Regions:
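Short coil/turn motif common to extracellular beta-sandwich-like domains
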Residues: 384, 403-410
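Surface-exposed interfaces of beta-sheet-rich extracellular modules
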Residues: 408-434
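Assembly/oligomerization interface modules of large self-assembling protein complexes
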Residues: 51-140
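Small-residue (G/S/T/A) turn/hinge positions that recur once per unit in extracellular repeat modules
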Residues: 393-402, 429
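Extended oligomerization regions of viral-like shell subunits
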Residues: 213-335
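Conserved "repeat-terminator" motif of extracellular CCP/Sushi domains
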Residues: 383-390, 436-458
Length: 458
């Protein structure tokens, strides 16, 4: 962290005043230069008090400077915003019911007064995924002799302060970045775990009968245009009331000003290069909460695409551990995920025997994911094949034979005369029943064999 000369003078002057207290007000010595300040401290043997005062003063100054930095990710919230995030209550939209105002029993007779206590709509309370909760702490030790030598000249004092707090501030920013990344990655894992994700590469290859790989897709203008269009279309669709874009199946919508678009930098660079002024891409980058992200969880040594686009998340509230590569974009309501890293405070302990001062800093940290809010993951991955096992006493057909996450395949069953469908499953998992002859399979990116079993009518 860099300070200018005027900042250094103000910081040190205020710190000396704090260290000397009432004694300082009784002196008339000049305190406009560092040498005089050093003499003042020496006269009152107040180096230890000065160090503590200096630490607190710098912390206050850092807070003031940090106010103008802003967050690099919209996920990071202050204490009040985070408190509001984790205390949300959701109201489920009630179904329309017949109102008895104008009703007459059986169409004849007198009006019957309806009871005001027959309303049965309930309030739904959200359940959040919490993680990363705890206290961040870092400690450093500085010899008191360093304080004395820092008063030789302004540059020495600047070096002293920078050396004292640069490591602390870097650690603070790194931890802030890590808790933010962990929050976003857990939110993506939750969406992937719930099937709220789209494999754009598999979709493109299936739709246009292509065989692009992840590598060739990133240099294909046609694919990049398709991907940008689909992401942009999802952003617009999320503006309509729907349950399609959140894991909890909650009826909600996301307006453009509340939409966060987090784009992997390598994919964003590819679209910039190959699409240039393409309308779909420009509409995405123009959104108020558009953010470029160099990597989701790790950069690796070379910032290669496979590493930067991957997440590997384990959380007790997820049904499965989630490991996914090729993630290029995460669009979500600003209420989907929040991280907090604040309530920062400092402390000092003087060890007179060793003539050192131990300086420590603490901050509260944590994050939460809300599955009631809209969130969709877009990624590039390979696809699998869906097939039917041999069927006795009937037949069946698939709406698609390509397996990729987000592809809902309809199984149409045709029992032979005198038979009906007993079960339709993949392994031990029964497929969702639509009606007596139609079933839905939510595909993954893996191969799958669907077994249809017919049973004779009784």
């Amino acid at each position: 962290m860099a300070y200018n000369v005027s900042q250094i003078k103000n910081i040190v002057n205020d710190s000396v005043k704090d260290a000397l207290g009432a004694n300082y007000s009784a002196t008339k010595q000049e305190t406009s230069d560092f040498v005089s300040l050093g003499k003042q401290l020496a006269n009152f043997n107040a180096y230890e008090g000065f160090f503590g005062a200096l630490a607190n003063r710098i912390v206050r100054t850092i807070y003031f400077i940090r106010t103008y930095e802003g967050s690099s990710r919209s996920v990071l919230r202050d204490e009040h915003e985070y408190g509001a995030f984790i205390q949300k209550v959701y109201y489920d939209l009630p179904e329309a019911v017949d109102n008895p105002t104008w009703s007459i029993p059986n169409g004849v007779g007198k009006y019957v007064q309806a009871s005001p206590y027959d309303v049965q709509a309930i309030v739904g309370v959200s359940s959040l995924i919490f993680g990363g909760k705890g206290t961040w702490s870092i400690e450093i030790v500085r010899p008191i002799e360093q304080i004395k030598s820092a008063f030789l000249e302004e540059s020495a004092m600047m070096n002293f302060i920078s050396g004292l707090y640069e490591a602390v501030e870097n650690a603070f920013k790194l931890q802030e970045e890590e808790i933010t990344n962990l929050a976003v990655n857990t939110a993506m894992a939750s969406s992937l775990d719930g099937g709220i994700a789209r494999n754009l590469l598999a979709e493109y290859n299936a739709k246009y009968s292509q065989s692009l790989t992840v590598a060739t897709a990133l240099i294909s203008a046609d694919f990049l245009r398709f991907a940008s269009k689909e992401i942009n279309r999802a952003v617009k669709n999320m503006g309509k009331m729907s349950t399609a874009f959140n894991k909890a199946g909650y009826k909600t919508f996301t307006t453009p000003d509340r939409m966060v678009v987090e784009m992997l930098s390598e994919f964003a660079s590819a679209t910039d290069m190959y699409l240039q002024s393409d309308t779909f891409h420009d509409e995405l980058t123009a959104l108020p909460n558009y953010e470029d992200v160099p990597f989701w969880q790790a950069s690796g040594k070379d910032f290669d695409f496979n590493t930067c686009s991957s997440i590997n998340i384990e959380h007790d509230d997820l049904d499965n551990d989630v490991s996914q590569s090729g993630i290029i974009c995460f669009i979500h309501d600003i209420e989907n995920v929040a991280a907090y890293f604040g309530n920062r405070r400092a402390w000092e302990i003087v060890n007179p025997r060793s003539e050192v001062v131990v300086h420590g800093e603490k901050a509260e940290k944590g994050f939460a994911v809300d599955d009631h809010a809209n969130a969709v993951v877009f990624y590039l991955g390979s696809s699998g094949t869906v097939s039917l096992a041999e069927i006795e006493h009937g037949s069946a057909s698939l709406s698609s034979s390509v397996a990729y996450r987000g592809n809902n395949i309809i199984v149409t069953c045709t029992p032979a005369s005198g038979y009906h469908v007993k079960s339709v499953n993949v392994g031990d998992v029964d497929l969702e029943k639509i009606d007596n002859t139609h079933y839905a399979y939510k595909a993954t990116d893996s191969n799958a064999t669907i077994t249809v079993t017919m049973e004779a009518n009784s």
